Amino acid sequence: MDAWSRSLERLEAEFPPEDVHTWLKPLQADLRVDSLVLYAPNAFIVDQVRELYLARIRELLAHFAGFSDVFLEIGSRPRPVEAQNAPVSTPSAHVSSEPQVPFAGNLDNHYTFANFVEGRSNQLGLAAAFQAAQKPGDRAHNPLLLYGGTGLGKTHLMFAAGNAMRQANPGAKVLYLRSEQFFSAMIRALQEKTMDQFKRQFQQVDALLIDDIQFFAGKDRTQEEFFHTFNALFDGKQQIILTCDRYPREVEGLEARLKSRLAWGLSVAIEPPDFETRAAIVLAKARERGAEIPDDVAFLIAKKMRSNVRDLEGALNTLTARANFTGRAITTEFAQETLRDLLRAQQQAISIPNIQKTVADYYGLQIKDLLSKRRTRSLARPRQVAMALTKELTEHSLPEIGDAFAGRDHTTVLHACRQIRTLMETDGKLREDWDKLIRKLSE
């Protein structure tokens, strides 16, 4: 393994995977006797590598190769024959008139539709992303907006769609960016007076995937440039897939015209996974790691960790790491011992007072209204929702929940839980309220 490969291996361990795939994987290395030349597909990557990674690359190169001279070039690494005949010159960064966007190196190939665990909370999002990948640019799902809390699988679906497009058409120009990367690229273009080039680079793609567009809020110039990019891609029938941490109309600081454009296609909420999906996710992630996890341990984690997929993965990573270190088998007792602090913190985060306040705020009530004896519909339904959420999200018994709601009988709590479950099968608004409250309480 040469010095660059060893340096890249260390960088992969130190930086987030999505950053490595976006900025470092597209680089082509030309390792010379006393220097390293890194070739990047475009000026964006040169800028990001110079600002964020170059100092660390030089440190690693000094350690592995004994020198720290690193030069950044835009273009492709010369072929060996050409390199032998080419005159020796000092490398320097230069910008070609039309640098190309790195269409292959910024998609994480690990995330596919095949390894996405489907459940009631995400099945519509999965279907929408799959359709967007099968028929990119179709007005029925262009743009496709996936929204929901952190760690629920939005980015997984986005990567899966991009990877499926490239699998179907290896020449497809699919570009993934986080919103702050779009912002940084635009700022750099403004500083260097290369906005025309910036616009051309983003408008030549077949599919543009941007994560976390709530970051655009309050950034007027960024929204303006994205608005024009959006229009050009939409008119050209190029697929746009976006994610947001909430429904865009709820994002303050996002321009009305941009919110209107986002409503042109399909917007799908990704909700926190239910118990069955959480258990399936734990078992699937364990299989990916080659770990043996008994079903009862997966059920324990799924029951206690209710917020998002990342928390489930974190619990699983902690469990398998300690099992490997100690050589102990993963049992229910071992899991409870290992995850004790994590599970306690999770339970403390979702308490009865927290649920009562969240429900009261959502329906424009006060907590005392939920606890009162009044039975008007405007109070009874939110009260039932709060009781049902408490049963769903905590370990409290029915009598304990009744006590917390002004000493109500446990049969009242049971009736509330059954009533809400039954109504949600036919009442779309109630289902929407329930999902939003789950999301708020899981944040």
Curated annotation (Swiss-Prot):
Q: What is the protein's name according to its record?
A: Chromosomal replication initiator protein DnaA
Origin superkingdom: Bacteria
Q: Which family does it belong to?
A: Belongs to the DnaA family.
What is the protein's species of origin?
Stenotrophomonas maltophilia (strain K279a)
Q: Which gene encodes it?
A: dnaA
Q: What does this protein do?
A: Plays an essential role in the initiation and regulation of chromosomal replication. ATP-DnaA binds to the origin of replication (oriC) to initiate formation of the DNA replication initiation complex once per cell cycle. Binds the DnaA box (a 9 base pair repeat at the origin) and separates the double-stranded (ds)DNA. Forms a right-handed helical filament on oriC DNA; dsDNA binds to the exterior of the filament while single-stranded (ss)DNA is stabiized in the filament's interior.
Give me the ranges of the annotated region Domain IV, binds dsDNA: 324-443
Free-text domain note:
Domain I is involved in oligomerization and binding regulators, domain II is flexibile and of varying length in different bacteria, domain III forms the AAA+ region, while domain IV binds dsDNA.
GO CC term, one of those recorded: plasma membrane
Q: Which GO terms describe its molecular function?
A: ATP binding; ATP hydrolysis activity; DNA replication origin binding; lipid binding
* CDD domains documented for this protein: Bac_DnaA_C
Q: Which UniProt keywords apply?
A: ATP-binding, Cytoplasm, DNA replication, DNA-binding, Lipid-binding, Nucleotide-binding
